[in-house]
Amino acid sequence: MSRDLLGLEGKIVMVTGAGRGFGRAIAHGYGRNGATVIAVDPDVELATGVASEVEALGATAIPIRGDMSVVLDVTSTFEKVEELFGLLDGIVHVTTAESKTPFVELLEGEWYDLMSQDVKSSLYVLQQGLRHLAGGGFVTIVLPPAARIEPHTVSVRKAVEGLIEGATRTFPGVRVNGVVPSRDPVGDPYDLPLVRAALGLVSMVSEGIRGVVLEVQLPEPPLEFEPYAALRELP
């Protein structure tokens, strides 16, 4: 996809959870297509590393330390962005909580962590983001992977979908959409289809599309060869 087709050249885009996984890959994708990337992550070293990687691609990038599940962090992050750039053109918020605990073994603390990292963070980003977006801006949320099918993870995903629907109805001038990866991140090039979806949803060719949650099928990486395990099987 060309920069002209996407219409991202010179746009100011904030990517949360940018330090690793899908967030890192998406930050790279926006940088490759000419956007100025604000890399936000709770770990400032990871945010700084990704910003440097984006700059190496020829784009402008700055790191900001921010935990989107903490309302004071969210507020201060958007205030810093406003001081530096004014209004944003777009936001990509990546939910980052993981739970592989069976439903019947789920403890209260883990449940609250899931709600905080995924639902609260999405709510806070939408609340603040909608105040700091330029006209016709966008918010794209990367939801928990579809492979997580335990009741508690499905309920979190549906709650975030509800926020997308509600924001779309309340703010029809903003393109609020979501993407659901089929699995957890494993790295380039296997996560590239999700990056393309996150770029395509906000491109000029997708103008008018809002309130949509797309499921993105990602290829499975090849199994790693474990020579020592193979040798142990020899007689």
Regions from the PLM with identified roles:
Residues 19-20:
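Conserved glycine-rich cofactor-binding loop
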Residues 35-49:
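Conserved glycine-rich Rossmann-like NAD(P)H-binding loop of the short-chain dehydrogenase/reductase
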Residues 138-172, 180-187:
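Catalytic loop of short-chain dehydrogenase/reductase
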